[in-house]
């Protein structure tokens, strides 16, 4: 029953009382709420960063022409049998992939958590959240190396975050009249 613009809220149905379509809509609504929460964003950034870092690490390890990490005792890897060479290469590739995945996941998780916390505290969604989160993340990750490294980390992460945010927000600009006017 509606009175003007105000609509009286309906009673909440249990899942047993809902149709399959209503159950699907309710499940999708709960999933969106979870993904938009700070813990959800933080976990998703960590997992996404882990997989992206894994692919990046695998690619970089496959392009590496130097001696594998754990083979300092081997004077010349070419002197080993082919099977042993392959074993060392794949072992090294796995270590590099996991290391890169772990680092990307950690950085993504920390940055996303800090940005979400800042956005919640400020109650605004603007570029300053990303800049501040970049500075805090970069400084926090480099603090063990000293205050100068923390300052450089802060500036570097803030600049990178600003560049990415500006690029992602550039879609709101009007498109060029033709391909030559940019």
From Swiss-Prot:
Disulfide bonds: 38-116, 135-154
GO cellular component: TIM22 mitochondrial import inner membrane insertion complex
Domain of life: Eukaryota
The keyword Ion transport belongs to this UniProt entry's keyword annotation: no
GO molecular function: mitochondrion targeting sequence binding; protein transmembrane transporter activity; structural molecule activity
Subcellular localization: Mitochondrion inner membrane
TM region positions: 43-63, 127-143, 148-168
Chief place of localization: mitochondrion
Keyword Mitochondrion attached: yes
InterPro entries (UniProt xref): TIM22 (IPR039175)
Positions in coiled-coil regions: none
Keywords: Disulfide bond, Membrane, Mitochondrion, Mitochondrion inner membrane, Protein transport, Translocation, Transmembrane, Transmembrane helix, Transport
GO biological process: one example: protein insertion into mitochondrial inner membrane
Membrane topology: Multi-pass membrane protein
Subunit structure: Component of the TIM22 complex, whose core is composed of TIM22 and TIM54, associated with the 70 kDa heterohexamer composed of TIM9 and TIM10 (or TIM8 and TIM13).
PANTHER family: MITOCHONDRIAL IMPORT INNER MEMBRANE TRANSLOCASE SUBUNIT TIM22 (PTHR14110:SF0)
Function, as annotated: Essential core component of the TIM22 complex, a complex that mediates the import and insertion of multi-pass transmembrane proteins into the mitochondrial inner membrane. In the TIM22 complex, it constitutes the voltage-activated and signal-gated channel. Forms a twin-pore translocase that uses the membrane potential as external driving force in 2 voltage-dependent steps.
Family to which the UniProt record says this protein belongs: Belongs to the Tim17/Tim22/Tim23 family.
UniProt name for this protein: Mitochondrial import inner membrane translocase subunit TIM22
Lineage: Eukaryota, Fungi, Dikarya, Ascomycota, Saccharomycotina
This protein's encoding gene: TIM22
């Amino acid at each position: 029953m509606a009175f003007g613009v105000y609509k009286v809220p309906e009673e909440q149905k249990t899942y047993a009382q809902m149709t399959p379509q209503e159950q699907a809509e309710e499940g999708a609504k709960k999933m969106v709420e979870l993904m938009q929460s700070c813990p959800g964003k933080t976990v998703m950034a960590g997992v996404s960063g882990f997989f992206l870092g894994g692919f990046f690490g695998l690619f970089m390890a496959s392009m590496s022409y130097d001696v594998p990490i754990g083979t300092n005792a081997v004077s010349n890897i070419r002197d080993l049998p082919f099977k042993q060479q392959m074993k060392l290469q794949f072992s090294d590739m796995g270590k590099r992939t996991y290391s890169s995945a772990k680092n990307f996941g950690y950085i993504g998780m920390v940055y996303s958590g800090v940005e979400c916390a800042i956005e919640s505290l400020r109650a605004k969604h603007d570029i300053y959240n990303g800049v501040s989160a970049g500075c805090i993340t970069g400084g926090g990750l480099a603090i063990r190396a000293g205050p100068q490294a923390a300052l450089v980390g802060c500036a570097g992460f803030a600049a990178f975050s600003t560049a990415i945010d500006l690029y992602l927000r550039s879609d709101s600009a009007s498109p060029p009249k033709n391909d030559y006017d940019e």
